[in-house]
């Protein structure tokens, strides 16, 4: 019902939503027949439906490499995230994880739900990994080794300073950016991007996730996960978990805005990285998550709901981003729109307002200087839908018929 209400409020979401639904069903039918590859692509859909859709942009050989890269790192992340594993057991596994990808027999019981299945049947991932080209294997092994070592370091170390924060995000996400750049280069479709730009691509996504997932991480049992740097949150509260309490709402929002401002420092590097891409499929694969990230930050900024539940873009807006992010002009336009949205929420009384506005103005200037803003229509933000009630009813009926056909064909 929530989706239907959102469509009635935003009728122009309908077409992108239908396209997204059809694309998802198409992706489900593209599962390879080989058992190990079938497992990998099915598992990809279970652990990240959005990534499973975005990866379809890539040619088959590169798609396979990126799929395995993602699952290997997701498995590594599952070990790191499982707070029930004793430190003396977890650290050696993280450090040696890169060796296990060559072992068809290795598995490790941890995680929950689909992540437990991934870990229990990791031999399928190893089997698929061993069928990749050597350059792909070397890139995946190298990044997995470096990431595992970095994760192990922060198992025993808190994120105290913003430098620690950048270092942690480098290990768990910046290295993903470096690895993807290596895979793109190994495919022969892209020049090798600089480490600094690749790192920023990962940091921007990771910091967005850390901001959005505050409540989930702080409520993790048996032990909470704390990724917000003490250097930032200690300016507002005595303990990180204090941010979720209603009596600290004003300070919590100020701290949140500080975190968002920190994340915005990576945007210009991300725009440069995407501008330098040549292959249209790789471009879409990289650009869609970045647009989703700036959109998510715009939703989270100055929003107390981050400390009450999950804040994310509505499904129709997500569908628009996936459908309409095709060129660099689209990216500049989306970043411009979401930055304007974010800027409109900045309160001059916020302690970081000046810094936030400075970073947003720099992003807006980069988008304007591209000279492309007048060449595309803004699909991302619409103030009020200009539709008559009759048209809305007609759209609702059409949607009901289409959804009935889509779901009816399954039975």
UniProtKB/Swiss-Prot annotation:
Its cofactor is Mg(2+). It holds the Pfam family SQS_PSY. Its EC number is 2.5.1.21. One of its GO terms (molecular function) is squalene synthase [NAD(P)H] activity. NADP(+) binds at residues 49, 74, 212, 312, 314. InterPro entries: Isoprenoid_synthase_dom_sf, Squ/phyt_synthse, Squal_synth-like, Squalene/phytoene_synthase_CS, Trans_IPPS_euk-type, Trans_IPPS_HH. PROSITE patterns: SQUALEN_PHYTOEN_SYN_1, SQUALEN_PHYTOEN_SYN_2. It is found in: Membrane. GO terms for cellular component: endoplasmic reticulum membrane. The keyword Nuclease does not apply. Converts farnesyl diphosphate (FPP) into squalene, a precursor for sterol biosynthesis in eukaryotes. Belongs to the phytoene/squalene synthase family. This is Squalene synthase.
């Amino acid at each position: 019902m929530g989706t239907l209400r959102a469509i009635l409020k935003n009728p122009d979401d309908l077409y992108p939503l239908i396209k997204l639904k059809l694309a998802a069903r198409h992706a489900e039918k593209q599962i390879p027949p080989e058992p190990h590859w079938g497992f990998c692509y099915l598992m990809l859909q279970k652990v990240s439906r959005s990534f499973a859709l975005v990866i379809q942009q890539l040619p088959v050989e590169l798609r396979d490499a990126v799929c395995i890269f993602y699952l290997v790192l997701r498995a590594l992340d599952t070990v790191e995230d499982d707070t029930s594993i004793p430190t003396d057991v977890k650290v050696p596994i993280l450090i040696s994880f890169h060796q296990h990808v060559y072992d068809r027999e290795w598995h490790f019981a941890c995680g929950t739900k689909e992540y437990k299945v991934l870990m229990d049947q990791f031999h399928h991932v190893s089997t698929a990994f061993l069928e990749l080209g050597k350059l792909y294997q070397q890139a995946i092994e190298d990044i997995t080794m470096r990431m595992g070592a970095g994760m192990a370091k922060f198992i025993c170390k808190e994120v105290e300073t913003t430098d620690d924060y950048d270092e942690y995000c480098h290990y768990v996400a910046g290295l993903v950016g470096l690895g993807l750049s290596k895979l793109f280069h190994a495919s022969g479709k892209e020049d090798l991007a600089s480490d600094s730009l690749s790192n920023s691509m990962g940091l921007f996504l990771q910091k967005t996730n850390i901001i959005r997932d505050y409540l989930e991480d702080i409520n993790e049992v048996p032990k909470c996960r704390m990724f917000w740097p003490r250097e930032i949150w200690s300016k507002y509260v005595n303990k990180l978990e204090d941010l979720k309490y209603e009596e600290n709402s004003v300070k919590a929002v100020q701290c949140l805005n500080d975190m968002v401002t920190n994340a915005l420092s990576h945007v210009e590097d991300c725009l440069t990285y995407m501008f330098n891409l040549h292959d249209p499929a790789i471009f879409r694969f990289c650009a869609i998550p970045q647009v989703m990230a700036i959109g998510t930050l715009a939703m989270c900024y100055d929003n107390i709901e981050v400390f009450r539940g999950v804040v994310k873009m509505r499904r129709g807006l997500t569908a628009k981003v996936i459908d309409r992010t095709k060129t660099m002009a689209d990216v500049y336009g989306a970043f411009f729109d979401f930055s304007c949205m974010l800027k409109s929420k900045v309160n001059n009384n916020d302690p970081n307002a000046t810094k936030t506005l400075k970073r947003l103005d720099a992003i807006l200037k980069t988008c304007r200087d591209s000279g492309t803003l007048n060449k595309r229509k803004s699909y991302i933000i619409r103030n009020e839908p200009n539709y008559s009630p009759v048209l809305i009813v007609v759209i609702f009926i059409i949607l009901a018929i289409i959804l009935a056909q889509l779901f009816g064909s399954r039975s």
